[in-house]
UniProtKB/Swiss-Prot annotation:
Keywords: Cell inner membrane, Cell membrane, Membrane, NAD, Quinone, Translocase, Transmembrane, Transmembrane helix, Ubiquinone. It is a multi-pass membrane protein. It comes from the Bacteria. It comes from Helicobacter pylori (strain Shi470). It is found in: Cell inner membrane. GO terms for molecular function: NADH dehydrogenase activity; oxidoreductase activity, acting on NAD(P)H, quinone or similar compound as acceptor; quinone binding. It catalyses: a quinone + NADH + 5 H(+)(in) = a quinol + NAD(+) + 4 H(+)(out). InterPro entries: NADH_UbQ_OxRdtase_su1/FPO, NADH_UbQ_OxRdtase_su1_CS. This is NADH-quinone oxidoreductase subunit H. NDH-1 is composed of 14 different subunits. Subunits NuoA, H, J, K, L, M, N constitute the membrane sector of the complex. GO terms for biological process: aerobic respiration. NDH-1 shuttles electrons from NADH, via FMN and iron-sulfur (Fe-S) centers, to quinones in the respiratory chain. The immediate electron acceptor for the enzyme in this species is believed to be ubiquinone. Couples the redox reaction to proton translocation (for every two electrons transferred, four hydrogen ions are translocated across the cytoplasmic membrane), and thus conserves the redox energy in a proton gradient. This subunit may bind ubiquinone. GO terms for cellular component: plasma membrane. The lineage of its organism: Bacteria, Pseudomonadati, Campylobacterota, Epsilonproteobacteria, Campylobacterales.
Length: 329
């Protein structure tokens, strides 16, 4: 077995382990953030400052009985959370999380694969995760799950179109689909960040990413007041945990990608080293998603579709045309 294969396997194991752990810890952070906005304490009983609440929740999750409803398609019911997990973690393959560094005289590239269509790969594999809620809803033999999967189809497909068109303008400016090249394009300094050249693309992509991530106010797939837990209604134990980890893994992936594409990525930020800079940026966007959840109410499905097709899509197309004209001039 070659050194390259061994290195890649080690990177994959580290990526899955780190982001699985971060997914669990993110629940604690989100509960604390929401509690702060709502003037509550949040988790505070299990361990100092409630830090061991994550471990307690993990033990409870793994010891719960794994129930499959009567009349459900067992194979597809089991396959759906696996698709969600695989889609979330495989989409991270082209993301450069940190600048290259040397360890014991060996240069380490902190990404799985630097492919020249990295951004397209990220969007395509992430979009494949749409099959998880669709199959989960269809296989559960539950009306609420079925409604949730139908909402997943219209919401995720609609916003996948918007996010893809939105990101075309920044890619036209850079001239590459590689996330490493996009990062290097902004290495000149603060004013080279693409957010200043493509502010409309940033806003549209951020909104579309929240819709794709099923984050409030766009969590129509599992709206508690209307359809219980949506496509997850019949899931429990480890299978439910896989959906939950996949959702947070997608959140971290989008936070890193937004930081790389629009905010200079892992380039040094003044006196702040690049590795720390990208952690600050990605951490801010994770926090922003929690802030939005605490601030905005749910939207109706018709409002969401109107915003997608009548507002965001025309703006994305207009941005592409204007960017093309500016490049030609």
């Amino acid at each position: 077995m070659s050194a390259y294969i061994i290195e890649t396997l080690i990177k994959i194991l580290i990526l899955v382990a780190v982001f699985s752990a971060l997914g669990g810890f993110a629940t604690y952070i989100e509960r604390k953030v929401l509690a702060y906005f709502q003037r509550r304490l949040g988790p505070c009983y299990v361990g100092p400052f409630g830090l061991l609440q994550v471990a307690a929740d993990g033990i409870k999750l793994f010891t719960k009985e794994d129930i499959i409803p009567q009349g459900a398609n067992k194979f597809i019911f089991t396959l759906a959370p696996i698709i969600a997990m695989v889609s979330a973690f495989v989409s991270m393959a082209p993301i450069p999380f940190f600048p290259n560094f040397t360890l014991f005289g060996y240069e380490i590239k902190p990404l799985i694969s630097d492919i020249n269509i990295g951004f397209l790969f990220f969007l395509a594999v992430g979009a494949a995760g749409i099959y998880a809620p669709i199959l989960a809803g269809l296989a559960s033999n539950n009306k609420y799950s079925l409604i949730g999967s139908a909402r997943a189809t219209i919401q995720l497909l609609s916003f996948e179109v918007v996010s893809t068109l939105t990101i075309l303008a920044p890619l036209m400016v850079v001239g590459s689909l590689s996330l490493v090249e996009i990062n290097n394009y902004q290495s000149g300094g603060f004013l080279d960040w693409l957010v200043f050249k493509q502010p409309l693309a940033f806003v549209l992509f951020l909104i579309a990413s929240y819709a794709e991530l099923n984050r409030t106010p766009f969590d129509l797939l599992e709206h508690e007041a209307e359809i219980v837990a949506g496509y997850c209604t019949e899931y429990s134990g480890l299978k439910w945990g896989m959906f939950f980890l996949a959702e947070y893994a997608h959140l971290f992936a989008f936070s890193f990608v937004i930081s790389i594409v629009f905010f200079g990525g892992f380039n040094a930020w003044g006196f702040i080293p690049g590795g720390i800079a990208i952690l600050i940026k990605a951490g801010f966007f994770v926090f922003l998603s929690m802030w939005v959840r605490a601030t905005y109410p749910h939207v109706r499905p018709d409002q969401l579709m109107n915003m997608c097709w009548k507002i965001m899509l025309p703006l994305a197309l207009l941005n592409i045309v204007l960017t093309g004209i500016i490049i030609l001039i």
